[in-house]
């Protein structure tokens, strides 16, 4: 099928996981006038029991989520606060109560979080849309056409069960993961 006329945006982010959605949110918070399009190949919402790399934050990540992205309320209400890094040394023991544990014994000044990625990504998908980002799931990117001059870049995509579409933007960011 022949692609329809391209939609025009300031930024296209390919990938609607943790990296793509947090970047979209940060861009909208910093530059509210930007037209941001996020393309995600999987259907949303994702399963809540979704295990991926990045489930455990460190303090600088928590600072980013809370203060740069303004997600403190979500973290406090829906995620599990933790005491920073913890190390366990088995010393040949199989019983967890018998192993050596090294880590903070009280809350740190800046908390860190054990993040449930499914819940977090679903929240981020909803939040970016509340902030005016266009979020398109089930969008399989077929090709990029990167401009060599000041012309916009083009992304061609296929919607599951739909037609071939294209979008153009000054910036195209690959946050598609592996």
Annotate each language-model stretch with its function:
Residues 8-9, 33, 168-170:
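Active-site acidic short loop of glycosyltransferases
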Residues 3-19, 37-39:
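Beta1/beta-strand and adjacent pyrophosphate-binding region of the FAD-binding site
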Residues 28-53:
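Glycine-rich FAD pyrophosphate-binding loop
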Residues 60, 105-127:
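Short beta-strand to alpha-helix junction loop
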Residues 46-94:
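N-terminal FAD cofactor-binding segment of flavoenzymes
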Residues 6, 93-97, 162-166:
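Short, mixed charged/polar active-site loops
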Residues 19, 23, 44:
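Conserved Rossmann-like nucleotide-cofactor binding loop
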Residues 26, 46, 127-178:
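Predominantly flavin-linked oxidoreductase catalytic cores and closely associated redox partners
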